[in-house]
Each structure stands twice: as structure tokens, then as C-alpha cells.
Amino acid sequence: MKAIILAAGQGSRLGHMTDDRPKCLIEFNGRSLLDRQLDTLDTNGVSEAVVVTGFHDELVNAAIDRRRSAGQGPIVRTVFNPFYKVADNLGSLFLVRDELNGDCLVWNGDTLVSRSLMAKVVSNSGRDGICVTIDRKDSYDEDDMKVVRDIDSGRLRAIGKRLAKGVNAESIGLLAFRGDGGARFADAIEREMRTPEGTTVWYLRVIHYLAQHSEVWTLDISGDEWGEVDFPEDVERAEALVKRWDEAREAKAA
């Protein structure tokens, strides 16, 4: 399995923390967000990763070179997105659309997930096509990527931040593609990028469009831990989260 990590953005909503480094290189308990994502993939048998870079790409490349020199997996390639300042994340995926073949993941570069959560995503091989990893909670705010899905079947019916009716889950920023799912997504990305508004579109809008006329599935990981780093207040929560994960692994290894 291969993973595509979208890490081109600066993360300007984090203020001075990203003045001179991209969001994916912020450290949590001594390791960068990107390192932790790659560690999680490697632990779960994902052998290859493609990291889409943009803001201060030279720092990301240097971080990956250090991993490579230390013999740390997975095998990583980078693709530079020169349009990261003017195009949304659909532009990043457009540049790597040919990578959307076979079994692959698309992972937002600002999301941390537990290794057990990733194990569920990687092992969910019984569901071909496109599968959006979702969580559930009592209420959803305006910044959540909200989801409407069929409870019984798990089929996704709608996804977007502006959904108002029927919301019963949120996307955590991790998608899996199997069978023809990647090819369907790649074709839809290319169609959308040919429209006047293509560069302003989030890739999950394309997933929403696909769900209106074809099957898109969800994987409910409620109970597993994850965190998104978007705002300054998220950093403290993410730090506490990864410390807990690290301490649990250390205790298990002792």
C-alpha cells in the first residue's frame, strides 16, 4: 500500500509557529508531525509514501533525507507543488493524480492518528472503492468537515463544512482507495481542475460530487484517538495526545 501525504501548506492559522517552517515540521514530544505520520505508516506496513510539498519544501526534503540516512521507513518521494499559495489542496492532488492507483491512502498533512486507528484503515480491505475515515461526536462546529452517511450501510451521502441537515459524522482527513477507487478519484480531480473554480476547491468536494452518483463508503473509527492541528489551541492538545501514545508504547516495551 502507498500513502499520499498533503503537506504543501504553510499553516498560517498557527501564527508565528509557521513563520519559517511548514506545519508538518512542528514537533510534538520531540518528533515532527511528518515524522509521526511516516512512523505510523511504517509500523502498519505501508511501504511507500509520496509527500506533496510547497512552503519551505527544502526543509521537508532535508527532514526526509535524515530519515532515509537513519534507515527509517517507509520509502518516501516528494513532489513539489509550485502553486501552493494560490491553489487549494485539490491542486496538490492534481499533481500526483497518477499515483492514485492500486491500494493507496490520502492523508492530510496536519492530522495525527494513533497506530491502532491506522491499522483499522489499512486492514479494511473488504471495502473496495473509496472509503472516508470518519468519527462521531455529539455536535459539530463550523470548521468540522461534516458528513452525512447511511448508518446501516456506511455509505456516504454528503461531505462538506457547510452541511446543516442530517450531519452524523466528521471526516478526519484520511481516505483509502482500493480497486477502481483511485482511478475514479483521479478522473474526477482532472474534470474539476478544468473548471474555472478548480484551483479553489478542496478535494473533499470532489468526493462529495462522486457520492451523488456512485458509491463512496465510510469507516467509523469512533473510540480511536486522533487530532488535527489547525489552530494554536490544537497544538497543546496534540502535544498531550502524542505524549500519552509515547508513554503507552514505552510502558508496553518495558
Model-derived features: positions:
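N-terminal nucleotide-binding beta1-loop-alpha1 segment
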Residues: 1-18, 252
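Short catalytic helix/loop segments, enriched in acidic residues and glycine
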Residues: 20-35
